Structures are given as structure tokens and as C-alpha cells.
């Protein structure tokens, strides 16, 4: 199967699965199809899916991730002041490393907004359906939403990383005002220590 055939198979499968989407016109261009597939993956709830689908999805995402480019952490240089510290800017879903961190919501099931530009959405898109299914299994066993600062670990699935650490970050519950600047400083570390 070619990459185009895989993409079309995955789109057709997901459209047939959701009756309201079944009447969706499939774009003829590659980018339009990639966006439609990503959107369908984003909105799909965590429920069982066929092994045939997962096999083709895994082949598609493996190739797609190669197309997007992979950055091997072993090719990066550490900072001069500390050989244990690396500074890199880029898309963490392309990192070949031991683990990446996913900033997620308290349900831990990924972002359900089609084409949303959050890291949770990108990680779930390029890792594949298995990630949402695994997180659903973990959260069902836990029986409650994840607390801020707690974390879960999963395989990287189709991402080049070995593992994904999923954590819920703090959520600001109040209006941010100029007074909030009192807790900041030119150095983020100093700002934290002054609280």
C-alpha cells in the first residue's frame, strides 16, 4: 500500500465509523486529506478499533513522522557550562529521545478539538489511536481526573520517542493583572524563589 492509499483507507474507515461524518467530501489534495485525517483522529472517542486499522495507521504514521523529520537527541550538543544540559527549540513530536512531556488536561485523553494547535493534540495525532485508548484504560482504572502536577507514563507508540510523560499543568483560576508581575523577575528561577 502506498502512503496515499493508507491515508485514504484511514479516512474512509473513520468516516464510515461516524455516520454524521459519512457525508463528508474527501479533499483531493494531499494537505486537505492530511487535515481531514487529523481532524477525524482528534474527535474520535476512545473505543475499540480494528487491528487492521491500527496496522495501516501505524505504517502511515511511521512514514509520516519520517517525512516530517526526526531529530535524534544524540546529534545535539550540550551547553558549554553543563554537559548534562541541552537546549533545543523545535517540535517535540519529532524528537528521538527517551521521553517527552505532554502538557494535557485533567481527563488525560488528548485534545478533542479538530486541528487545535496545542501540544496535546499534536502528540495524540502523531502517536496514533493507541495512545488515547491507553490513556482511557489508565484513567478508567484510576477512577478520577488527574490532579495538577501528577503524571502518567506511556509508550511513545508511533512517535520517535520511547515514552511520553503526561502531566496536568497549573490552571490560572483568576484574572491575570499587573499585580501578578510582582511575582516575576528577569530570571524565572529568582521569581519562583521570591514567592
Predicted regions and their residues:
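Generic alpha-helix structural propensity
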Residues: 48, 52-56, 87, 114, ...
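Non-catalytic accessory regions outside enzyme or core folds
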Residues: 1-76
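Long amphipathic N-terminal alpha/beta scaffold segment
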Residues: 59-99, 103
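Single conserved hydrophobic/aromatic residue that forms the stacking wall/gate
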Residues: 183-194
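Glycine-enriched loop-and-adjacent helix/strand subsegments that border the catalytic/binding cleft
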Residues: 99-100, 104-185
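Short, mixed-charge, low-aromatic patches
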Residues: 8-17, 77-82, 142-148, 177-181
Amino acid at each position: 500500500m502506498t502512503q496515499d492509499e493508507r491515508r485514504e483507507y484511514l479516512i474512509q474507515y473513520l468516516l464510515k465509523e461516524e455516520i454524521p461524518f459519512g457525508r463528508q467530501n474527501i479533499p483531493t489534495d494531499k494537505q486537505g486529506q492530511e487535515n481531514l485525517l487529523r481532524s477525524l483522529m482528534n474527535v474520535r472517542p476512545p473505543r475499540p478499533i480494528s487491528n487492521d486499522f491500527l496496522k495501516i495507521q501505524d505504517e502511515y504514521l511511521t512514514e509520516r513522522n519520517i517525512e516530517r523529520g526526526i531529530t535524534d537527541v544524540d546529534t545535539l550538543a550540550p551547553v558549554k557550562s553543563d554537559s548534562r544540559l541541552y537546549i533545543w527549540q523545535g517540535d517535540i513530536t519529532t524528537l528521538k529521545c527517551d521521553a517527552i512531556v505532554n502538557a494535557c488536561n485533567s481527563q488525560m485523553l488528548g485534545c478533542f478539538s479538530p486541528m487545535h494547535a496545542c501540544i496535546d493534540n499534536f502528540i495524540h495525532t502523531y502517536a496514533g489511536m493507541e495512545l488515547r485508548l491507553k490513556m482511557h484504560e489508565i484513567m478508567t482504572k484510576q477512577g478520577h481526573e488527574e490532579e495538577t502536577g501528577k503524571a502518567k507514563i506511556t509508550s511513545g507508540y508511533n512517535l520517535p520517542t520511547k515514552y511520553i510523560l503526561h502531566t496536568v499543568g497549573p490552571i490560572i483560576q483568576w484574572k491575570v493583572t499587573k499585580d501578578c508581575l510582582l511575582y516575576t523577575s528577569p530570571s524565572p528561577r529568582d521569581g519562583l524563589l521570591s514567592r
